[in-house]
């Protein structure tokens, strides 16, 4: 025990070296590599921050992007000469009704039709001329070009399709697909509808005025027939009066001539009686002639009346039966037009115009208020 305690005591008595005198620990190779990597990362971050700061600073003007213009394509379209290919049908300008409708349309209203026919909008001066020269599409039905035209027409609104139908003298009733088929079928082989030329409103109004004037003249003629007969009777009375006056003057002259010879023979008295009888017979003959003349005139007037009645009987029944449309008929036409029309686009003026076109023989301007009220009732 004493031997073990002795070294321990020796150890306790030995001096402890100070901490500052310890040797510095040398870093290993791994620690050096990690420090180098950290330094590199710090340098990279600093470089990135500097680049960001540089990018924020605007130096000079920004480079503009060059605009690519399709000048070559436009010039190629302009250089292509305009040619009208001959179709299978008749030229639109040679069809009377279509020529009439074309003359009434403005050039701006024909742009879409021109584009449909020739794949170009056309100029204002040549729109009507080019549309009139069209005689049908050169391609067949069901081809790719036909389908392209069909797709082009389907993009049009109903109002535009109906205006095209109006120019081409086609029915304007139906759905979009029906109108498209109708227009394409006609444009493949244009031909006249066979209907007569529509009368303009001015001519129809003049015609109605003439009809009114003619009816007024017939009434006047009927009224003037009676005065003519009366004038004949009065003329016969005047003739009788004149004859009486002449006979009285003749008697006075004869009496004056007979006065100087006071003595008259029986023969002279008989002669006087005979002359008086002859004068009476002349008077009766004059009266009969006047009566016969009046009867002849009456017969002539009755013949004229019968001839006018016969001529009116010879007229066709359609002329006699033609009457302006009733309120119910106008209401039905307005119903049909509203059913086919697009209420968001159609105006009251267009509906009134279409109603007038359904009845071109009559002037319906006086019944415009009734048409408007019916439209409002049907819409509400």
Swiss-Prot record:
Q: Coding gene?
A: Dek
**Where Phosphothreonine occurs, residue numbers?**
294-295
Pfam families recorded? DEK_C (PF08766), SAP (PF02037)
Family matches, as InterPro entries: DEK, DEK_C, SAP_dom
DNA-binding positions: 342-356, 372-376
Q: How does it assemble?
A: Found in a mRNA splicing-dependent exon junction complex (EJC) with DEK, RBM8A, RNPS1, SRRM1 and ALYREF/THOC4. Interacts with histones H2A, H2B, H3, H4, acetylated histone H4, non-phosphorylated DAXX and HDAC2. Component of the B-WICH complex, at least composed of SMARCA5/SNF2H, BAZ1B/WSTF, SF3B1, DEK, MYO1C, ERCC6, MYBBP1A and DDX21. Binds DNA.
Q: How is it modified after translation?
A: Phosphorylated by CK2. Phosphorylation fluctuates during the cell cycle with a moderate peak during G(1) phase, and weakens the binding of DEK to DNA.
Write out the GO cellular component annotations: B-WICH complex; contractile muscle fiber; nucleolus; nucleoplasm; nucleus
Q: Where is the composition biased (Basic and acidic residues)?
A: 20-31, 52-67
Q: Name one GO biological process term.
A: positive regulation of transcription by RNA polymerase III
Q: What is this protein called?
A: Protein DEK
Task: Drop me one GO molecular function for this one.
Answer: DNA binding
* Modification Phosphoserine occurs at: 20, 33, 55, 76, 125-126, 163, 205, 208, 214, 231, 234-236, 247-248, 255, 292-293, 301, 306, 308, 311-312
